[in-house]
């Protein structure tokens, strides 16, 4: 966070906006929510001002504003241009990450098949050459395939992301996406890398707390903040229509254990049936 703070007032617009985005997300994990809101506000104001005329610079403004909104599951700014107008103008590595953001946007629209297709196409066309964008692309593919109940494809993408991440310990993305991954971390990472899983979950608790403090007030969507990560992951599946037996099989736990997680979550959230869980879950 301190490394980016000095660039928040940089004269170069691309550097300043990149710093704002990185700084905002670092602040979410650190619990500095007012600082995160200020950085996100600067991003929105820059796009709204429309002062930049250079196409490449304007594309950078649009990308950063797009990423800031989509990754916090917020409405897009009114001034947001179509993605196809700015994606081609971004440098290749950044374009790969922007395709992750676009795929994430399609996921939020429940267009899971097209989102997954975008990921597969991006990876096939060279995005795998950029490790960090590749990790994020594989993770959004997990989100898509779990939404489509294609668990084998989801696991393949998760483990590919894990293979890319492990040499340099790039585990932050896994913690950031935990609740969206359909309990795949519990199913595939926890049994084989338990200590790494614990570190990922520590990131999840810190990041998601800050994320909700920005997301919930703006959207009025009260994403649950009093569940354990396992309860949340199980409830995400239950809210999407997975049966207790399917959840138990996915996590390799007993049906009674799966039912206990759901019952405890319902008690905490004061709801009486599984359908009511959905209002407290991520989209």
Residue ranges and their predicted role:
Residues 19-21, 57-64, 98, 137:
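The tetratricopeptide repeat
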Residues 67, 77, 91-121, 126-134, ...:
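Linker/hinge segments immediately adjacent to helix-turn-helix/homeobox DNA-binding domains
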